[in-house]
């Protein structure tokens, strides 16, 4: 006859002993099934002097593993390259590229600032680079603090990997900067091959 306490211990060993259950639960809670799944990295930006920058659409982007609040991250982007800002996203393929970049450089901390913020409790999100708000891929139920000053800045990879969330702007996160390639390439200059 098996005692009920023994069954509990046996279940604990089976579920937690291998670590697989905890890994699966963490992945479920995070909204993903396999963070390390292969993804398609974008091509290098190929602008001379800009290593670790990748071409995503018409911009070059770079991941920065230096947690800053939203405002400091935006200003840090501006110091890296003339005309640079926190990244804006305009189609799903570009969103996927950004996710791949984050996975490559910091697979254990996927949360990053995007260059989006809510304009004065209006419920309208804008990109810091002034580009059109023509794409969004929010986590279910987000943004959930519109018309307040609680969470006015946008992040990626909070609860569902590859999706967005509104968060408090003072929170420190890693981030991705972007600049328009044509702003750096001067007429007659050559791209690095």
What is each residue range found by the language model?
Residues 1-193:
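Extracellular, disulfide-bonded carbohydrate-recognition/adhesion ectodomains
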